[in-house]
Amino acid sequence: MPDFERKQLPHGVPNWVADGAVYFVAINCRIRGEDQLTTKSKSEAIFEAFRHYESLGKWHVRLCLLMPDHLHALISFNTREYSMSSIIRSFKGYLAKEQQIDWQKNYFDHRLRNDAALEEKAQYIRLNPVRAGLVEQATEWPYLIEAEV
């Protein structure tokens, strides 16, 4: 059977998109089903990296939830100074080196166009561990950071 080649979409942000637009981002580990993200030490390192990139002015993380083999986040990128793909490439590279996380090559992003879409994706993200059968209530999942808005 031939290898399946997944179509790769460009991650460039058009110049007509306002800086500060919020994106739904999903980043997967290369090996699905293996817990690479939700150990105490790795989750702390990942959240610290999110905070560090925010302190550098590269992004503003509204919400990030770690699952065992992927993460979901709602992020506003500083696209005036950095490209979205370069920020995520750097973030993934740092965590691959420091925490030996084996990421998939690419990532998924979708720009959220209004507050209703933002809240819908936030709820989707918060309920992910419930849908996966990892907890009964979303509030029981410890691998979540959420900014005060």
Predicted regions and their residues:
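Short catalytic/metal-binding and nucleic-acid-binding patches
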Residues: 1-149
